[in-house]
Each structure stands twice: as C-alpha cells, then as structure tokens.
A protein has these predicted regions:
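Structural preference for beta-strand elements that scaffold enzyme active sites
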Residues: 2-5, 45, 104-108, 131-132, ...
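Short acidic/histidine-rich active-site segments
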Residues: 236-237, 269-293
Length: 329
C-alpha cells in the first residue's frame, strides 16, 4: 500500500544534528524517517516541512535563516540521492517520479512567521519550491494567532485569527499555488480561512476533537467545512492528539486502533475524501505504536479491521492527497 504523508519534521532534526557537529545520514539513521524506512513503508511521497520555533533561545537565532538552512538540506538530499528520491514542484514531477520508480518529496513550511510579514519572502519561498505552509506554529506572528494558549490544550482560541497581513498572505498564497495549512491555527483563524479562501486548503496534521479534545484537533463543524471546500486532513500520530486523555500527555498513547477510530469519525462527518495521513514524524515524542515510517502496514491493517474497504484504505493512504495536489499544485 503506497503512502503519502502530509507532514514531518525530519529536516529540523537533520539541521539540529548538523549544528551539533554530528550529521545524520539520510540513507539510514535513528530518526523516524530515512530512505530505508521510506522503502520499507512503501512510500509514494513525503512532505518535508521546514519548521522553525519562533522562541528558539539560541543566540542570534533567526527564523528565516533557520528555514532557509532546512530548505538547503532538502536541496542537498535531493542532489545526493537522485536515483532514489526527487522533488515535486508540479503534478508532472509526481508522474515522472512514479514512472521512474523514485520516492517523491514535497517541500513545505511550518511557521509562516518565518516570512516576517513580507510577501517578497513568501514569493521567494515559492521559487525555492515550497508548496504548502502553515500560517502559524504555536506563537502569534504577523499573520495569525495559534490555538496554543495559556489556557491549556483543551481551550481553543476563538477570539483572534488572521491579521490584515494574514489575509494578504492567504490571497498571495492562492495565487502562488501554495496550499494554506490550517494545522496549529486558532479556531477563529480556521474560520477566517474558510470564509476568505477561494482554493481548497489542508489541515496537514490534525485529528478529530470529538475523540481527542486537544485544541490542535478539528471540531466536527471544521471537518465538514474542510470537506465542503475540497480540502484534506492528515491523521496525526501524536499521542496527545490521538488519545482521549489530551489533558495528561504523559499518560497518552497513540495506537493504530485509535487512529483508525479517528479515520472512521472523519469519514462519518466529512466523507472518505477528506482523510489523508500527516504523521508528524520526527516532531513527536511519547508512546506511539507507529514508531517509524517503516511501520505503516500496521495502520492499514487497523483500518481494515475498523471496516474500511481496500479502496477506502488506499484513498486514505495516498489517493486523496494525490488528487488534492494534482488539482492544486
């Protein structure tokens, strides 16, 4: 079963290893994702996020520099293993990579704050190959507010959403065919996107709030709106977003059976076409039954036990994401 994963933080971990003077091989390493694990998991495409923490305490830390360094790592990986993996910037790239038997890699950004409110920076990121971007991570920025807030993980931010510059970014992202990613965005920001977007958008790594009440997950109303706009949501393997006990993350566990329940809820509320995968590999800790990309057959088996047909499992694993990006790149 082919796999299309909408989100991982592997570039961040590779950059961190380089900064520590102990670079990791992309052929085989101790991370959740490397080329061997992608082979074992039968991957078609992995979205690689250039992620940055705006509160990075490192002296002289600059979010844009951090993102550019991660993009540089992405480019170097593509150049180092051209016979195994190749970037996807257009739908034609995907078809060519499939025909040549290569893994595909799509470049994304997690934290629109790296642009510092500059549309010029956004346009440059698109030229470098970025095809999806979250407006926020866990901190307010020039574009929007997140759901992370002092009230804790069970409290959603319904008061602040996109800024004036955030709306300008949304408009420009749609012109540039950079998919707007609403994962991490506040509830208010989500509805701002719904009400002002003209193209489908994604929640690259978010689950169902009805099953796990963390504010990073989507309410049923959000799932319906996302589906109506032609969007997709990637199942996130993070234990706090999978388990029902989101208020106690140290006690949470992510199992394939529980992930299958989230998939079933997505299907019931928004239909099968809204569901995709968004592992958050290399960005999550804790107890996870899916320990690496090599373990993906386990989730397919759980989905079948949950009652999904083979066609539906295939839709979740790659066909929905393939359709979405074929129409939106």
């Amino acid at each position: 079963m082919k796999v299309w994963d909408l989100h991982c933080d592997t570039l961040y971990e590779l950059r961190r290893a380089e900064k520590a003077g102990a670079p990791k091989s992309f052929l085989h390493n101790d991370l959740h994702i490397d080329l061997e694990k992608l082979r074992q998991g039968d991957y078609l495409l992995q979205c690689f996020a250039a992620y940055v923490d705006l509160a990075d305490p490192a002296p002289g830390a600059d979010p844009l520099v951090s993102v550019l360094e991660e993009i540089d790592i992405f480019k170097r990986l593509m150049a180092a293993y051209p016979e195994k993996i190749a970037p996807v910037y257009t739908a034609a790239d995907l078809e060519r990579n499939r025909a040549e038997g290569k893994f595909s890699a799509m470049l994304t950004v997690e934290e629109g704050g790296c642009c510092k409110g500059s549309l010029g920076v956004l346009r440059r990121l698109q030229e470098l190959g970025v095809r999806m971007m979250t407006l926020t991570w866990n901190y307010p920025n020039e574009l929007a507010a997140p759901n992370a807030n002092p009230g804790g993980p069970l409290v959603a931010n319904t008061e602040t959403g996109l800024t004036e510059q955030g709306f300008a970014f949304l408009e420009e992202m749609e012109k540039l065919h950079i998919t707007a990613d609403v994962s991490h965005l506040s509830d208010k920001g989500f509805w701002d996107i719904v009400n002002h977007s003209t193209r489908p958008f994604a929640a690259s790594h978010s689950n169902c709030r009805a099953l796990s009440p963390h504010n990073r997950n989507l309410t049923d109303e959000m799932i319906r709106a996302l589906a109506e706009k032609g969007g997709i949501a990637g199942l996130n393997y993070c234990a706090s977003f999978v388990d029902a006990d989101s208020a106690h993350p140290k006690l949470c566990r992510s199992t394939v059976e529980r992930l299958a329940k989230h998939a079933a809820h997505f299907k019931q509320v928004g239909g099968i076409e809204v569901i995709s995968l968004g592992s958050d590999f290399d960005g999550i800790g804790g107890q996870h039954e899916l320990e690496t990309a090599a373990d993906m057959p386990l989730l397919a088996e759980a989905l079948r036990r949950e009652g999904f047909t083979e066609d539906e499992v295939e839709a979740i694993y790659w066909r929905n994401a393939y359709r979405f990006f074929k129409n939106n790149l």
